[in-house]
Amino acid sequence: MAKTPAEKPATAAKKPAAPKAAAAPKAAAAKAPAAAKAPAAKKPAAPKAAAAPKAPAAGLEGATGRLVQIIGAVVDIEFDGALPAILNAVETVNTATGQRLVFEVAQHLGQSTVRAIAMDATEGLVRGQPVRDTGEPIRVPVGPGTLGRIMNVIGEPIDEQGPIRSDISRTIHRDAPSFAEQTNTAEVLVTGIKVIDLMCPYTKGGKIGLFGGAGVGKTVTMQELINNIAKAYGGYSVLAGVGERTREGNDLYHEMIESNVNVDPKANNGSTEGSRCALVYGQMNEPPGARARVALTGLSIAEYFRDEEGKDVLLFVDNIFRFTQAGAEVSALLGRIPSAVGYQPTLATEMGNLQERITSTNKGSITSVQAIYVPADDLTDPAPATSFAHLDATTVLSRDIAAQAIFPAVDPLDSTSRIMDPLVIGEEHYTVARRVQEVLQQYKALKDIIAILGMDELSEEDKLVVARARKIQRFLSQPFHVAEQFTNTPGAFVQLKDTIRSFKGIVDGEYDHLPEGAFYMVGPIEEAVAKAEKMAAEA
C-alpha cells in the first residue's frame, strides 16, 4: 500500500539505468539486484490503494532517487538528476509499516550517490525503493500550537492527541544570531535551590550545565528546576528529551499537567490551549539519527518564541551527552576516522553549531539548562569537556556527596558561575558564598588529618571549622517537590535573600549550638531551628 505514491517516479527513474550500467561498472553490481527487485516490489501496489497513502509524501517536490545500500541507520541513495544538498531531508515510505521515513543527507559520495542518516528504524526498506528530495532540511511545526504537545524529531505528534494545530513551521538547521543581534545581560535567575542560588547562581538568558555520572541525580535536579522555574516564571518552556529514558519523559509529561504548567487535553475537549511547555522526545530506544537531531528540533521551537514573539524562553535539554553519543554512532558508518576515545572528529563543530544558537538577542532570550552525563565520572572526557567552553554556569554533581545521602549532590567547590561577581550578585551574596567555600575547603584539607589522627588531635579552631563545615554540608541539602512521593517530605522553595541570611548565620557561628542533624533536608534556617527543638523535645 505505502509504495503507491512513489510508483510513478520509480518507473521514470528506472529508464536511464541501462545506459548508466555500461558506463559505470561499479554501480552495475549494486543496481542489478535493485532492478530485479523493483518489479517485485511494485506488484502488490494495486489501484485500490492509490488514494490512501498519498498523505505522507504530499506536496514534495524535487529529484527522485532510489535506495542502493542500507547499512543500519545509514543509507546510500542514487539520484538520476541533481543531487539534494547536504542537510536536505529526503523521504520515502517504509513498506513494512506504511509510515513516512525521513533521512538527512550527510555526504555526497560521487557517481550521483548521496549518503543519508535515517530518522527512524530502517527495517522494512528494500533496495531500489524510490526516495524523494524535499528540497530543504527537516521542517517541523512551531508556535503556540506546539505547547502542551509531544512531538518527535520530524515534528510528528506522539502523544495520541491528534495532529498539531499549527500553521507555522521552521527548518531545524539555522544560522546562529549575528553578533549585532546578540545581547548580554547579567540578571540572576532564582531557582529556589539553596546550593545553586548561593554557590553557582544562574543567569537569565545563559547556558547552564548539570554535570554528573550515572545515578547522581541530574534528571531529578532538572525536573525540580522545571518545576520551580517554569511554574514561578510563567513564560514558555521547551523540553528536549535527547536519548534518555522513555519512562522519565512520560512521568514529566504527567507532572507538568498535575502542576498546571500544561493543560490536560482529555479534560479540555482535546485542546491544550493555556499550556506553557512544548515537549520534543527522541528517547534512548530511537535510532541515532533521531537522537542526533532532536535537540535541534526543540531549539527551533524555542527560537521561534524568541525571534517572532519576543519571549524569554526556557530550554531544557536532557541529555546533551546523548547528542554527542548519537553522532559518534553514525560517524563510523559515514566513513569518518574517529578521534580521541572513539568520538567523531567533528565533535567540537557539532557542539558549537548547537550551542551558538542557544543565545539571547535584542528580541528575546533563551535560558538553557542542559543535563550532561559524565562517562565514568571523568570530567576530562571529550564529550563533557567540549561543553564546558559554551556554558555560563556549571553545576557539578558529585558521587561522593550523593554517597553521604546529601541531595541535590552538588559539589560547591567544583561548581562555578560566570556571574559570581560582587558587581552582579551583590557584595553580601559574594562574601557569604566565598566564606562558605573557605570553610568547606579548610574541612577538605583537614580530612586526611582526621582520618589518620582523629578529631581529638585538632586545635579548637580547627574543630570549630569542621563542625561548621559539616553543618553547611547538611544545610546544602534540600527536599525537592518532584521527590515528595518518594521521601514523604514536602518540597522547599527557598528565596535568595533567605538563603544568604541562613548561610551567613552559620559561618558567623550563630547556630553553633544546634546539632548537625537539624540542618539536614530543610528549607530556610528557621526550619533547622524548629527541627532542633523537636529533636531536643524527643530526646
From Swiss-Prot:
Keywords: ATP synthesis, ATP-binding, Cell inner membrane, Cell membrane, CF(1), Hydrogen ion transport, Ion transport, Membrane, Nucleotide-binding, Translocase, Transport. CDD domains: ATP-synt_F1_beta_C (cd18110), ATP-synt_F1_beta_N (cd18115), F1-ATPase_beta_CD (cd01133). It comes from the Bacteria. It catalyses: ATP + H2O + 4 H(+)(in) = ADP + phosphate + 5 H(+)(out). Its main location: membrane. It is a peripheral membrane protein. SUPFAM superfamilies: C-terminal domain of alpha and beta subunits of F1 ATP synthase (SSF47917), N-terminal domain of alpha and beta subunits of F1 ATP synthase (SSF50615), P-loop containing nucleoside triphosphate hydrolases (SSF52540). One of its GO terms (cellular component) is proton-transporting ATP synthase complex. Its EC number is 7.1.2.2. SMART domains: AAA. Residues 1-44 are annotated as: Disordered. It is found in: Cell inner membrane. The keyword Transport applies. PANTHER family: ATP SYNTHASE, ATP SYNTHASE SUBUNIT BETA, MITOCHONDRIAL. F-type ATPases have 2 components, CF(1) - the catalytic core - and CF(0) - the membrane proton channel. CF(1) has five subunits: alpha(3), beta(3), gamma(1), delta(1), epsilon(1). CF(0) has three main subunits: a(1), b(2) and c(9-12). The alpha and beta chains form an alternating ring which encloses part of the gamma chain. CF(1) is attached to CF(0) by a central stalk formed by the gamma and epsilon chains, while a peripheral stalk is formed by the delta and b chains. HAMAP family: ATP_synth_beta_bact. Belongs to the ATPase alpha/beta chains family. Produces ATP from ADP in the presence of a proton gradient across the membrane. The catalytic sites are hosted primarily by the beta subunits. This is ATP synthase subunit beta. It comes from Caulobacter vibrioides (strain ATCC 19089 / CIP 103742 / CB 15). The gene is atpD.
